[in-house]
Amino acid sequence: IPGESMEQEQLFSAHNLLDDLMDYVFSGKDCRVIFIGDTAQLPPVGTELSPALNARYLKSRYSVDIIEYELDQVMRQSLESGVLSNATRIRKMIGEEDHSVQVFDLNDQEDVLEVESDYLEDLLVGSYSDDKIEGSIIVTRSNKRANLYNREIRNRILYREYEIEAGDLMMIVKNNYFWLPENSEAGFLANGDIIEIMGVRNFEEVHGFRFADVTIRLLDYPDQQPLDVKIILDTIMAETPSLGREDGRKLYLSVLQDYEDIPEKSKRADKVRVDPYYNSLQVKFAYAMTCHKTQGGQWERVFIDYFRITSETLDTSALRWLYTAVTRSTDKVYLLGYPEHCFVR
């Protein structure tokens, strides 16, 4: 796939990854591409549909023949699961014209539970204990809310005193191709991968940003040896999904100045491409995340923060958000702060 859509140094123009992918696939002879996904989940940020899962869009834009299949056997939950029945309920509501605010059916449910505020802290303490922490997640509607939850969990439940410590779980929030060798099992550090901080060695401020040298392990690749990387601290509590375009441009230009003694422009760019500060890993804490960030992952215990429901009916985007959040769970769903009119009992 061309670097325009994948590499961090392309900060001055926007490119369409799907366009680049289709160009790459069909530049070969007799090539095919398979897109797999759930059309009821949240579409990419800033869009109302998932283009790669929309046959009409693909035919119109790329003039290709499309074959569609639908998988209907659930593998993540048992057929008797309340998580499954509520996910199915919401999915059906997405296809209906009238969207009732009675989203959740709590009748005889033991795995989809309303949590009263008086019991929330005790429940979180139990769920974020050492032997359960990797199986718990709070799903919330904004990075600002996620930051608040992450701060409270680290301070009041995990008793973390410093900005980042050994034992912290973090999510990579932007693909990184620098720190892992290509022949490793993972291949690269992917947006959405969960890591554990094994050790923190050094903090520094340079290029107008703050960095730390840390040792990490990849939770999804237990055979991968711990890895020494440099992370950028500014993204951790930012209210944006990752380092913004302007900040990325600022970092690029600052790093570029370190190599201004090199006369050839292409050679200066090559130096930036392998610079550890420019390639610093972008991360956020992984105790609470936005719904978009949780897509593709699964946890035993999913706490769903209240998604503001103020009208008599829900719009489709809100239902997609709730459906995506519910389907992250393999065991239990806890509903935080939802008013009574959201439930069927």
Regions found by a protein language model. Name each.
Residues V206-R345:
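C-terminal accessory regions
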Residues N16, D20, V25-V33, T39-M198, ...:
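Conserved helicase motor core of P-loop NTPases
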Residues P2-Q8, N107-D111, Y278, I304-T310:
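Short, basic, glycine/proline-bearing loop/turn elements
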